[in-house]
């Protein structure tokens, strides 16, 4: 029972997310959608100058931790939208819908 464990090299590129101009693709996609939304609503592309500090701020944060954007998005998916935290004393991923459909919960 003296078997050697197999050793394999895990490269850093295999552990970090794909980046676009220094920002993870999920965050870059959100920024691009926000830029399109600004153009449609305001109809002036000069307001997209606001996007540059956000992009470089996200880039500085991602330089320290590649998964920081994923952690924030995960927080927004769980605790950020938890409406019953006062009832349960913390964030829960509740399987119950906010509104009950008129036909019940699929029993009839």
From Swiss-Prot:
User: What is an example of a Pfam family matching this protein?
Assistant: VirB3
Can you tell me which residues the record assigns to a coiled coil? Answer: none
- Protein biosynthesis: is it a keyword of this entry? no
What subcellular compartments does it reside in?
A: Membrane
Q: Transmembrane segments in this chain: where?
A: 22-42
Task: Give the highest taxon in the source lineage.
Answer: Bacteria
Q: How does it sit in the membrane?
A: Single-pass membrane protein
Q: Which UniProt keywords apply?
A: Crown gall tumor, Membrane, Plasmid, Transmembrane, Transmembrane helix
Asked whether the keyword Transmembrane helix is assigned, the reply is yes
An annotated GO cellular component: membrane
InterPro entries from the UniProt entry? T4SS_VirB3/TrbD/AvhB (IPR007792)
The record's function comment reads: VirB proteins are suggested to act at the bacterial surface and there play an important role in directing T-DNA transfer to plant cells.
Instruction: Please state which protein family the record places this protein in.
Output: Belongs to the virB3 family.
Q: What is this protein called?
A: Protein virB3
From which lineage does this chain's organism come? Bacteria, Pseudomonadati, Pseudomonadota, Alphaproteobacteria, Hyphomicrobiales
């Amino acid at each position: 029972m003296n078997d050697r464990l197999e050793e394999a090299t895990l490269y850093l590129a295999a552990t970090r997310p794909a980046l676009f101009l220094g920002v993870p693709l999920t965050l870059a996609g959100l920024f691009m959608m926000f830029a399109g939304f600004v153009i449609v609503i305001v109809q002036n592309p000069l307001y997209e100058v606001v996007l540059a500090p956000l992009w470089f701020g996200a880039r500085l944060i991602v330089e320290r931790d590649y998964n920081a954007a994923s952690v924030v998005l995960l927080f927004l998916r769980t605790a950020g939208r938890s409406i019953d935290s006062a009832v349960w004393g913390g964030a829960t991923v509740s399987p119950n819908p906010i509104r009950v459909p008129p036909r019940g919960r699929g029993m009839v």
